[in-house]
Design a protein with these regions (language model features):
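Conserved pre-motif I regulatory segment
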Residues: 184-237
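Conserved RecA-like ASCE ATPase "motif II neighborhood" in helicase/translocase motors
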Residues: 380-390, 401-419
Length: 567
């Protein structure tokens, strides 16, 4: 029973269908309306309750307007918990009756809002939740009033106190450095052990699949100790659809990991398989607390929530440099960060639909996509999600990673000079393509822009931690005229790379410098010859018969890059 007020907006619930909009008034009346009638009614009504604003507005064919989006409320009340971003998906996770018509979907949205506010009203008092909600209220969050009432958050705090509610880094625990791990032993996995483990993992009610048991026994020799330097034991195993390959190799891998007190790294190509493995490993470690210690999903840094990026975003908000509405997205991110298992925003427990609702700037763009990590120099290093995951992996039994990360680590000798001794490569047919991707370089506008920023540092009006080569080198070469002259030459050469607003200039035919000139001609050729029609997310064209000027621009860019590369 709720212990605090459960307030709901006196607003209609709207569902946009193919044939019109279902309008469920707050007092229960249902109408199906055309677009013009909806617009007329909205002029005198409360902002409506809807689900997934972006798709709702797209279906109506209108510009966004003020709404109560139930998904935003769900992201606040149940951060890091999965739901499909639909009325039916919400009903399913909240234990409500599943809707089978648009009218029932509208009813379901109202019921979902009531259930979520009621859930808040029964939670133990939580200072963090109230502080975050107050910060979001200052940004104009529609749900703020019922949420604050349900939380019993009291009077509005000073603006500084409200902004401090977003300082999640102060509430995250610090990770502890583990001591050096004892090298794993080399006890073998007998085929009979692999088969027995498979039976245990599948349980007594599982379908009898002899091929799966044969597979588990056949791959067990891959875990034997090597007999010659540089000659690991390799089992190349293939099996048809339906055999159950995943559990077939998890069984011997888990036996080896426990017997030898070491980690087996399972390398995949796709995120879907990583998610599948994460779910399958619940069989091995049904206790969630034990699983956190024993299973780690490793990814590149660009996949994880960066606390420093988040702190800088909240700092811009406090200083007035950010738009007030950004507080809504940042507040929902704060809620998620406090509940997330590992801070993984790409395929982890981050709800991907949240970026559709509040924008990439306060969600996905908070990852470290630009390689600007300052590592131990960062104020939040001891609470960093990435560093925490790296340390957890050192003591784990099963580590799931992707081919690219595994190969890069192998090429660089591993973290602290230590490499895993046992690997399973699933989706092995992608290894060569993954290697090409991991060890190749892209000649793109974004890559060139990053290189310019690394060399010159942040330029006028740009939010970046890049200090530039001059700042990094000045203490080392102070007083050395020859070195200073070489530095000046390098910085002049770097200006051939695309600067701020290069995309607008390239698209507008106002390219500046050899890189932008080259990209402009490439863009011209792609747009002139692509055949994908409306498929604007994947434009491509052949390299044959280059458009006039492209080869000359390529030659000029090559000369400029050679000059930049010279010591």
């Amino acid at each position: 029973t709720p212990t605090r007020p459960v307030l709901l907006p006196d607003a209609p619930a709207l569902i946009a269908g193919v044939r019109g909009v279902v309008w469920l008034s707050a007092d229960g009346e249902v109408d199906t309306l055309a677009g013009q009638e909806v617009a007329r009614r909205l002029q005198s009504a409360q902002p409506p309750i809807i689900c997934h604003g972006r798709s709702f507005f797209a279906r109506l064919g209108v510009k966004p307007f003020a709404v109560f989006d139930v998904l935003e409320l769900y992201a606040f009340v149940r951060p890091a918990e999965f739901t499909l971003p639909t009325p039916r998906g919400l009903a399913e996770v909240l234990g409500l009756a599943l809707p089978t018509s648009h009218e029932q979907e509208a009813e379901s949205l109202m019921a979902a809002a009531h259930a979520l506010i009621s859930e808040l009203a029964t939670m133990p008092r939580d200072r963090d939740s109230g502080a975050i909600a107050w910060a979001m209220q200052r940004g104009g969050w529609r749900w703020a009033e019922p949420v604050l009432a349900a939380l019993g958050a009291g009077e509005q705090p000073h603006s500084g106190s409200a902004a401090a509610g977003l300082a999640v880094w102060d509430r995250l625990s610090e990770w502890n450095d583990r001591g050096p791990e004892t090298p794993p032993r080399d006890l073998p996995v007998e085929p009979v052990e692999a088969r027995a483990q498979l039976v245990k993992l599948l349980g007594s009610g599982a379908e009898n699949r002899p091929g799966q048991a044969d597979y588990a026994g056949a791959v067990a020799p891959a875990f034997d100790a090597r007999n010659k330097r540089g000659e690991p034991n390799v089992v190349l195993a293939d099996a048809g659809t339906g055999v159950g390959k995943t559990m077939g190799y998890i069984a011997p891998a888990s036996v080896w990991a426990e017997k030898n007190e070491g980690a087996v790294w399972i390398s995949t190509f796709t995120r879907n398989l990583q998610r599948q493995l994460d779910a399958e490993l619940d069989r091995l470690y049904p206790d969630p607390v034990e699983k956190i210690d024993k299973v780690v999903i490793r990814k590149g840094r660009e996949n994880y929530f960066c606390l420093l990026n988040f702190a800088e975003a909240t700092g811009r908000l406090r200083s007035g440099a950010g738009a007030p509405g950004e507080a809504i997205g940042l507040g929902l991110m704060a809620r998620w960060a406090l509940k997330s298992r590992d801070g993984d925003m790409i395929g982890g427990d981050f709800p991907s639909w949240l970026a559709d609702l509040v924008g990439r700037g306060t969600t996905l763009d908070l990852t470290d996509k630009r390689g600007e990590c300052t590592y131990s120099a960062c104020l939040h290093y001891s609470r960093c999600f990435i560093e925490r995951t790296i340390r957890r992996a050192r003591g784990a039994r099963i580590v799931v990673a992707n081919h690219a990360l595994v190969m890069i680590q192998a090429a660089m000798g591993g973290e602290e000079g230590q490499l895993p001794t046992r690997y399973v490569f699933d989706e092995g047919h992608h290894i060569f393509g993954a290697a090409d991707s991991a060890f190749s370089a892209d000649l793109t506008g974004f890559e060139a822009e990053d290189l310019r920023r690394w060399l010159l540092g942040a330029e006028a009006g740009r939010h970046s931690r890049s200090r530039g080569l001059a700042v990094r080198m000045e203490d080392l070469i102070a007083g050395d005229d020859e070195a200073m002259a070489a530095l000046d030459e390098a910085l002049r050469a770097a200006r051939v790379l695309p600067g701020p607003a290069w995309r607008q200039r390239v698209a507008g035919g106002e390219a500046v410098g050899p890189t932008e000139e080259f990209l402009s001609f490439v863009r011209q050729q792609v747009y002139a010859r692509e055949t994908g029609g409306a498929a604007t997310y994947s434009l491509e064209a052949g390299t044959e018969s280059p458009v006039p000027g492209l080869l000359e621009a390529a030659g000029a860019l090559e000369a400029a890059l050679i000059r930049l590369r010279k010591p």
